[in-house]
Structures are given as C-alpha cells and as structure tokens.
Amino acid sequence: MGVTIRNRNYDHGSLPFLQSLLAILLVTTTTLHINGVEAFHEIHYNLQSVGAENVKQVHRTGYHFQPKQNWINDPNGPMYYKGVYHLFYQYNPKGAVWGNIVWAHSVSTDLINWTPLEPAIFPSKPFDKYGCRSGSATILPGNKPVILYTGIVEGPPKNVQVQNYAIPANLSDPYLRKWIKPDNNPLVVANNGENATAFRDPTTAWLDKSGHWKMLVGSKRNRRGIAYLYRSKDFIKWTKAKHPIHSQANTGMWECPDFFPVSLKGLNGLDTSVTGESVKHVLKVSLDLTRYEYYTVGTYLTDKDRYIPDNTSVDGWAGLRYDYGNFYASKTFFDPSKNRRILWGWANESDSTAHDVAKGWAGIQLIPRTLWLDPSGKQLMQWPIEELETLRGSKVKFSRKQDLSKGILVEVKGITAAQADVEVTFSFKSLAKREPFDPKWLEYDAEKICSLKGSTVQGGVGPFGLLTLASEKLEEYTPVFFRVFKAQNTHKVLMCSDATRSSLKEGLYRPSFAGFVDVDLATDKKISLRSLIDNSVVESFGAKGKTCISSRVYPTLAVYENAHLYVFNNGSETITVENLDAWSMKKPLRMN
C-alpha cells in the first residue's frame, strides 16, 4: 500500500478549498427542508409519470439497494420466508419523483443480490383506491405471512387512512409473487376519537400469552404523538385498547412506529412476540416534524399494555436515534435463520428535484444493519450485516501504527476510494488537551456544534477521522470525525459527518450531521470508526456501532477513480492510527 503524508494546517485562510404494512404523508405544499430530508413529499403532478430517457450512472450506488430507475422511499414489510428474504418498498414505476406509489417487491437469498418481482400491492379496491402506503409483515402460525398496510380511501385534501391486510395467493411459492387483498378490508378504521388523516403505519403484530394478536398504528392528536394499540383473536376483528401503548406531547405525528423486544444478554435477536424478565423493549417512531427517527429502551407491561421508557434517555426530540443523518422510515424484522434482528432504512436525495428527474432515479435503501442491546442496557448497537463482507475486494492495511500530529493527512492508496469499506481504530495518550464544552451549547443539538467546530477548526483532542470522497487537491471532501470536549466531571465525544465541502455543485443541501457517542475514553483512550463509502453515500459507525451517521453527497471531482481517502488529525494532541483496514467494494452480481 502506498502512503502519502500531507502536512496541512486546517485554517480557514490557508487553502483554496477552505474558502468554498410506513405511511407516506400526502401533502400538497411547498417543500420544507428540515435537517436535509423533505418534511413532506413534494408533489409534482406534472412529473410523476415522466420517465428518464437515459438513466445517469454518476452518483448511483455500487452496492446499496436501489432499482434500475425511478423513485423509491420507505422499506415495507421485510421478512424471511422459506429461505428467501423479501423486501417490499414504496416505488413510483413511472418517474423519479414521488407519485403513482406501489409496493415494489424484491427477493434475495443473501441480502446482497436482489431479484425484482412484479409489484405486490397497488391501488385497486375501494379500501385503497387513492393509495397503498407503508406497512409491515407478520408471520402467523403455520408459517403463513400476512401484510398489514395503510390504504387511502379518500383523496386530497382529506386523505382518509385505514388499515388493510393482504395474503399470499400461493404459500408454496417461496417468492410469494402474487398477493390477494380480501374484500373484508379494511380491518381497522379511525373512530371519532382518532384523526383519520393521521392514522397509519401498522407495525408487525405480536402474539401475547392470552392468545391475542396486538399491533400498533401511528397517529397524533394536535401536537401529541400517539401509538394506538389494537387487539385481535383471529387477526381479522380488531379492537382498539382503552389507551395508547405510549404517547408524548409536542412530538407531532408518529410515523413508522416499530415495537420489538431485545435480549438483555448477547447479540441474538428475538421474535417480536417474546416477552419476559430477560428482555427489554424498544419503541421507535419517525417524527414527521423533524424527519428523524427516535427510539427509547424500556419496559413493556404486558398485563396493562403500557410501554414505559427507561429514564436513561430522553423520550422525545432530544432522544436517541438509529442514525443522526439521512435515514428515515425504517423497519426491522426478525431473521430466524441467523437469530438476529435486521434494520432497513431509507435515504432520500439531497439533490434537487430537477436533477432527480434528469438522472432518472431517486432514493436508496441503506445497508441492512444487525441490531442488539448494548451491555449497559441504555442504547442499541448497530452493525452492517455480515453478508456485506462478501463484496470486499482488494484490501490495504497500515503495516504499522501511524502517528498523526496536528495538520497531518495520510492517504490510503490501493483501493477504489469511491466505493470502499474502511475500518480504523484511533488512540491517544492523554485527554488533557480537551477543549472545554461551552455550557451554552447545551441549548444546541449536536449538528449545531459540528457546524461551529468542523474538521477545519483546530482543536485539542480532535478533530480526527477520515476524509472520504476527497478530490486530489481537496476542493471536495466529506470528513467523518470525532472531537472530544471537557465537560463537568466528564468528557463528551462528538461524532460528525460533514457534507459542507462535499461538492462544488451549486444548490445542494450540505448539512453537518452529528451525534454524541456514549463511550468512556478515560481508561481505554481508543475509539473506532467504520465507513461504508458508495459514490453518493457515506454510512459511518462510531465506537463499534454506538453512534451511526449517514450522509448523501454529490462530488463533481471526487468521482470514480478520481476519489481519494485520507486519515487526518487537526488537534494538538497527537493521534495514533492503531490499525486501518480498507477494501474496495464490488458490485453485487444482481441488483434488481
């Protein structure tokens, strides 16, 4: 492997480059960009059925899930059935903007290579005449899959929502090519106490010890986010519980709720129906107000059908997230073949609608992740599925430890830096040079601090990390880095994925995504980082998956063979690269 050392002082005046069964909300409004993800799906009636003459390949991902062309959004109803993984997803078969939505359907035996099938669900009945929105899959006894999804029974402006089900036409077909929507739909309608225009996203159902099936539906009342609970003995006749399983003031519409158990010990996942003293439960909601996903770990009181979050994290906007970047509308499922819980999440584009139409596609599914509970019991851990490693190609590694003093860049050569997987561990000798954490920053979120203290702002312990998708002269780059602050009687570790200098292209949304990492550096003085780099997306996992950040970026110079990868340090404390392994990533043999 070749190594290039550049002595760079990241000062703002020093270099030229430093000067530059999940429902979808149907709202016809001007697009609001909140934290980089559209707050409402932008409705372009004149573009919904405009197909691309030529699908442009620049910025298309090499190993992420996406169809050949057109728009995709929420992952729907993921499941494992008779040796086959299924992923349904919201898809516009006619264009690269939101509209004409159907449940597209792809199958795989390894979660890497995907074969597209005909759409499984599309508007065709009175109970979904105006739309088939997101939902979940449940495996009933006897290995019988059923899909719960939201149907739209009145068009704009009301968009009245009901909950429907669909069943396979042929259970002997492992690909489940054809689905039937029985005429006894809808199963659940909003009553007088519920908001029928904000009533969607049925979860995977679970079976309690009394023999009742239970599911959640997301909603809101004024600004209070709500997860309503429904019970059924036969999966057909559903009764609303007297109270929601959980709600929270000032959180707005709870989209895409997900509710599942996690084991207190070990990495194994659990079937959704598991309860008992050896498990905690996770409630995840996607907040329409912020377009981020939040979760809590807590206790499910089965006798009262109440969920009580632990007091180890905030229950609301300032709470834990699966991902602190471009990640939304997620859905998990239990994979019995490997006893794991797998998370799917959608990343939309940060480019303009005009560019989406011109290139002929929009949206990707991020790499599936395995979820488990951290030994502390306070948060989840996430890691890319092990199957991803089958795509690793040529490998480079540092043959020895590499010390990085302030301003040093070390280039990682010998791989395709535009399409790579890199794992690195950083260490340092002392925390003495930590910068003080300004008390007024407590009023800010992590993104604000990252925008103030970016990779070019010299610090004490950090910033240090990776420069991904970098051009040769560093006119473009996307840094993923850590910065350690001294807080009262402790330290705070900030992790950033900063798209500010990711592209010279005008009109892009270039956020400074960030989150804090709950890790004790006082004793070990080490922290790890893994980044999956794929042309227009960088997925990063800090501290073995404690904090995750995904960014969509669109370099103009750092594309294909012109992309570079570096490790860097811009803090006064010398940082040591303990080890670094990087791989070129191959394309799957089949991607839709």
Curated annotation (Swiss-Prot):
InterPro entries assigned: ConA-like_dom_sf (IPR013320), Fructan_Metab_Enzymes (IPR050551), Glyco_hydro_32 (IPR001362), Glyco_hydro_32_AS (IPR018053), Glyco_hydro_32_C (IPR013189), Glyco_hydro_32_N (IPR013148), Glyco_hydro_beta-prop_sf (IPR023296)
In the UniProt record, the signal sequence range is 1-39
Q: Does the keyword Hydrolase apply?
A: yes
List the GO biological process terms: carbohydrate metabolic process
Q: Which residues participate directly in catalysis?
A: D74
Alphabetically, the GO molecular function entries are:
beta-fructofuranosidase activity
Write the record's keywords in alphabetical order, separated by commas. Answer: Cell wall, Glycoprotein, Glycosidase, Hydrolase, Secreted, Signal, Zymogen
Q: Could you tell me which CDD domains the record lists for this protein? A: GH32_Fruct1-like
Positions bearing carbohydrate = N170, N195, N311, N348, N570
Top-level taxon of the source organism: Eukaryota
Belongs to which family? Belongs to the glycosyl hydrolase 32 family.
Record's protein name: Beta-fructofuranosidase, insoluble isoenzyme 1
Gene source species = Daucus carota (Wild carrot)
